[in-house]
Amino acid sequence: MVTLIVATTADPASINPAAALLAMPGWTAGPILPPDIKSFSNKQTRVIQHDRSIVKEDDLDLRWEEATGEVVDEVIFLSRHTAVSNRPALTVHPIGVLHLKDGESPPQGGKPGWAALPSTRIGPWFRLLKKMAEAHGLVPEFEITLEATHHGPITNKPTMFLEIGSTEEYWKRQDAAQVMALLMWEGLGLGGSEEVGKWKSETGKRKVLLGIGGGHYAPRHMDIALKDDIWVGHLLSGYSLPMEDPTQTKTTPGENYIGGNWRQSIKAAFEATKASFPGGEILAHLDHKSFKGWQKKAITEFLAEESINVGKPNDFT
């Protein structure tokens, strides 16, 4: 099984970390993935480089398997991050567009209602990235943060994005690219050390965070993710939980029915997280302050109906 790292030459925040990683020892040229995607190999890691949008080049894992006969175990995408604040940041996040209805067009890849399998490395690598960024002097200039689940491309294997933000000045920062390269080098065990964040289901029932609610940067979920030995699945921000206020809805299937695609989002996020962490204890954590009373009640009742356990911060130990 191989790890697929995907970079695009169209984005300096993508190709620079890939180039820094490829400058480290042990890489050899690999096959060309049709039509023109270069690849490089080191142990069980493959880096591929294309020149198109990072969020719209679908099914690269399946295309690699078909072209090479190798089985892809996981996919890691390198990308730029944008933010209204323009604040420099290094981010990690799962992907999917769970809240969209059939027929809606995702603006940044993926497909409506879809959640990628979240990489098991998200939590451990987030903590490792924070330590590395601090050790290399990027903090406090750069914020080290998780992001909520969003955008494509479509994948079929466990996936995560590593991003550098938030403006062109920072996308091109070589020190940020170097830290991202070191994260991959050490996290994948390419330097000979033990890899970080590989899930082993036989090691007992460990706790996996399923974040529900809050803003895009999920600060209350992030406080839990910073705890040692906590694993991270999907993180659903408020915009991924569209809920129709029953007092504003004229026609509803029942008096207490809350419309919107929020149920679809929660169910898809839970199922994908459960699939990535076989044997794990999936615990939903609600950002209570981000919900109105009727929203919290509806979500809590739905989680109980679906037999999804809910945890408070102190339950994640």
Curated annotation (Swiss-Prot):
Cofactor, free-text remark: Binds 2 Zn(2+) ions per subunit.
Protein's GO biological process: D-amino acid catabolic process
Obligatory cofactor(s): Zn(2+)
Gene Ontology CC entries for this record: cytoplasm; nucleus
InterPro entries according to UniProt: Deacylase_DtdA_archaea (IPR018033), DtdA (IPR007508)
Cellular compartment(s): Nucleus; Cytoplasm
Main location: nucleus
Record bears the keyword Zinc: yes
Tissues where this protein is expressed: Ubiquitous.
SUPFAM superfamilies: AF0625-like
EC number(s) recorded for this UniProt protein: 3.1.1.96
Highest taxon listed in the record's lineage: Eukaryota
Matches recorded under Gene3D superfamilies: AF0625-like
Induction: Not induced by abscisic acid, paraquat, 1-aminocyclopropane-1-carboxylate, ethanol, salt, sorbitol, cold, heat or low oxygen stresses.
Class of this enzyme: hydrolase
Keyword Chaperone: no
Disruption phenotype: Increased sensitivity to acetaldehyde and hypersensitivity to ethanol.
Keywords: Cytoplasm, Hydrolase, Metal-binding, Nucleus, Zinc
Catalytic activity: a D-aminoacyl-tRNA + H2O = a tRNA + a D-alpha-amino acid + H(+); glycyl-tRNA(Ala) + H2O = tRNA(Ala) + glycine + H(+)
GO molecular function: D-aminoacyl-tRNA deacylase activity; metal ion binding
Function as written in the Swiss-Prot or TrEMBL entry: Hydrolyzes D-aminoacyl-tRNA into D-amino acid and free tRNA. Broad specificity toward the amino acid, but strict specificity toward the D-isomer. Seems to be required for ethanol tolerance.
UniProt family annotation: Belongs to the DtdA deacylase family.
Protein name, UniProt field: D-aminoacyl-tRNA deacylase
Source species: Arabidopsis thaliana
